[in-house]
Amino acid sequence: MTKKYEFDWIIPVPPELTTGCVFDRWFENEKETKENDFERDALFKVDEYGFFLYWKSEGRDGDVIELCQVSDIRAGGTPKDPKILDKVTKKNGTNIPELDKRSLTICSNTDYINITYHHVICPDAATAKSWQKNLRLITHNNRATNVCPRVNLMKHWMRLSYCVEKSGKIPVKTLAKTFASGKTEKLVYTCIKDAGLPDDKNATMTKEQFTFDKFYALYHKVCPRNDIEELFTSITKGKQDFISLEQFIQFMNDKQRDPRMNEILYPLYEEKRCTEIINDYELDEEKKKNVQMSLDGFKRYLMSDENAPVFLDRLDFYMEMDQPLAHYYINSSHNTYLSGRQIGGKSSVEMYRQTLLAGCRCVELDCWNGKGEDEEPIVTHGHAYCTEILFKDCIQAIADCAFVSSEYPVILSFENHCNRAQQYKLAKYCDDFFGDLLLKEPLPDHPLDPGLPLPPPCKLKRKILIKNKRMKPEVEKVELELWLKGELKTDDDPEEDASAGKPPEAAAAPAPAPEAAAAAEGAAEGGGGAEAEAAAANYSGSTTNVHPWLSSMVNYAQPIKFQGFDKAIEKNIAHNMSSFAESAGMNYLKQSSIDFVNYNKRQMSRIYPKGTRADSSNYMPQVFWNAGCQMVSLNFQSSDLPMQLNQGKFEYNGGCGYLLKPDFMRRADKDFDPFADAPVDGVIAAQCSVKVIAGQFLSDKKVGTYVEVDMFGLPSDTVKKEFRTRLVANNGLNPVYNEDPFVFRKVVLPDLAVLRFGVYEESGKILGQRILPLDGLQAGYRHVSLRTEANFPMSLPMLFVNIELKIYVPDGFEDFMAMLSDPRGFAGAAKQQNEQMKALGIEEQSGGAARDAGKAKEEEKKEPPLVFEPVTLESLRQEKGFQKVGKKQIKELDTLRKKHAKERTSVQKTQNAAIDKLIKGKSKDDIRNDANIKNSINDQTKQWTDMIARHRKEEWDMLRQHVQDSQDAMKALMLTVQAAQIKQLEDRHARDIKDLNAKQAKMSADTAKEVQNDKTLKTKNEKDRRLREKRQNNVKRFMEEKKQIGVKQGRAMEKLKLAHSKQIEEFSTDVQKLMDMYKIEEEAYKTQGKTEFYA
């Protein structure tokens, strides 16, 4: 069964606050009238939910402070204006120190610059201390800023109830103002009357009259939720006035559930769970009894915490906090002290408080030598005409606020331009104000050794780390000992410390050009480079001559000049870190993106805005989050889109300022390219569809509104300024857009992607926005509550949207995916399709025959497979080349034999003549007994035998040579034939690849034409993205085909070459057999010992 998530957003409010206490209140503001600057004896209370601090005094209107906008409650506070101080002291006495102990300052704001200070004077110091403690307990309630629309309606009703006039009653006109931006005044007051409330403009009503049920009914009367009614009708199909249990189960599983989720870990909705939901939100007892949901119950469900747009458990600590520091994104600020522009801007201690209270965990201090007799170190933007603040005041503010909103470590990024004497003061103030909060030594189990990772955030809770240049350990040790003995000279050697300097006098020198300032800032941050060197004459970098005490306080954040990724790998020192201006960081990212990601797995990097951003604008942080950069520091004073992305992202994981990077950006065995379009190994790409249906309470004016939906993530996932609804004119209350869904077809990396809703007036002015992480997004019909530009919650403004989430499926694989996801359903659909085809007279066989015919036609186009005849001795003997050699050999043998025959004839004649001469005139008996004749015959026999043997040898030698020549000729012919076969196969393979490339080119052209003619793609960017996606899929498919062809061709070639090798082997064996035969015959002839003669 699907588990119910209990979203407990209420922090119990201490009874002391709900009971209330009488305080005096004073307010120091030029806009405030003199009558309002001091209020006596006001009863202050906090409501039971911890939404508001509200008060009312005799003869004055009631007022409220929304506690989600309260950033701090501070002890003390006395008026600077003498007139207000006079009023305060007349009522509370002239003992200012005692008065200060009884006072509290409540800071509220809707951005980080414009702070409103509410000062109250308590009856005594104990009450002040108790209220400060208790109020701090219920502020910074991250859950309360994410309550559902129905609770927000209740919250607004409570605000109206507390904003009473002098008589203690609620003005009807303030209620009417809630709905004035979309309806006529007459209609609003008519609806108020129908709700049973006074309808006169000047009328008032008691709290007892103005119940929440009446306000909720009035809301639905003035703003009828036709959008929800249409959805209700689509579920019931208009047949009844309720949703049955079966229909509700189907709706929850089909529409309200992410189909990508594992059904074991996240089971489907079933009868028991859906019955629980109906019982929770249905008020009609009869329908509840019948397990049915009415339209009213359906509205309550859709506007409840049960139906939040994101998984609400992500607001709590849900990430592991025991990984090395380098494995986390860290909420970071740039030039924290500035409340305005970078040049000529105002420096403010308050900015340190506000950024830390907002969850920032890395703040920057640009430290310079102080002026005047006390020479107190100051913080300012050097050479930029900015005002100055004292370093010790900044440190005090940091000590006060570092761990109010988060217990996880704070990193102080020092840009140190002070001489050694003043650096001693820097170290002393840090030691004095921070005490045990300052991490002065590395943790015992995390020493500063090469190859060891950084400690995890969980081991650095409530610790402050200093990022400042550090001396070499051996030098630091010696100098620290000398300093402790009082023997260290703190006078700076100008030659050794040319970089230390004083902040410029306003009239001393003109401000540097933005480019020079940027280059110099790069040098100060450790960026270096030619531009930095050129600017160094006018803009000094951080000092390298560090005081040993300050140096000894630096441990896990030791800045060094970046020397390249290879050098960083070689050193392998995790506690070394480098800072990069956004432009330098972008260059490294473009040139060595994978190396940059791997660098950030091991050690930390800090990115800061380039110096040309004089207006304190921000760069897009997403680019550097994609590379795994930890400290992507931004100008918190600018409530622009980059800051919205930053604060929207860091709202999750308890708002602690630390977010664990995705797994593949932490693992050493994984490489990740942030510019890749292809899916990441082990990560399933997603498809997201967003339909903007309607808005509620978008503006308090009758203006036209429209909504933009953007996505930010990897470059391939980022889609901005493309999806925009139509403009709904003159309705800021409840515009209905009902647009076609905006489809983000392929989200390669959902873990890094965020969805942004932006609501704008027709003039382009932003009315509200919301950042939602894609990995925590819930599918279905949801209400998205909006935030201000500075990401502060807005109670009533919201959008009603339908979000669909799917696994991304490339074109052509939809059926395959459907079959894998639901085999039975797919089989049933196929069967139904076949039955429908039969009903149309189309038999399955005919379709099969058509497919077979098409397949046969396709095969006809294909060339028949190559079949090579085996190369044998017989086939080679038929070759002309071999026959030519054979004829030549026959001729040579014939010539030799003729020569031998001629010699035999000549010898024969000679021997015959000699015998005839010897036997002439003799009888047979004489001849038989004549020794001379016998000797002559023996000599002739030997001569003839030797000649015949020689002839035979010469013939055998020629035959053997002929066999060798034939072997060589055959081998050459065989290699030629084999080479021809290989060439024929290579040509065939080349033709196959050429045909494949031609097919790819044709498909690419067809795809371009198809995308161009696709009417569903509205914008050029959408068409370009779709075309790129299709072409990538085509290329991937063709590369796979090419790979398969290559494998197939490789096998064919290997098979042919193996056959050739076998043929050569068989040929050599046959030739050797022939040679052996000749040799045996020759040896046999030699062993016979024949004596030959001619008779």
From Swiss-Prot:
GO terms for biological process: adult locomotory behavior; calcium-mediated signaling; cellular response to light stimulus; circadian rhythm; detection of chemical stimulus involved in sensory perception of bitter taste; diacylglycerol biosynthetic process; entrainment of circadian clock; entrainment of circadian clock by photoperiod. Residues 487-529, 842-863, 1000-1030 are annotated as: Disordered. Disruption phenotype: Flies have no photoreceptor potential, their eyes lack phospholipase C (PLC) activity and they are completely blind. Abundantly expressed in the adult retina. The active site is at residues 334, 381. Interacts with inaD. This is 1-phosphatidylinositol 4,5-bisphosphate phosphodiesterase. It comes from Drosophila melanogaster.
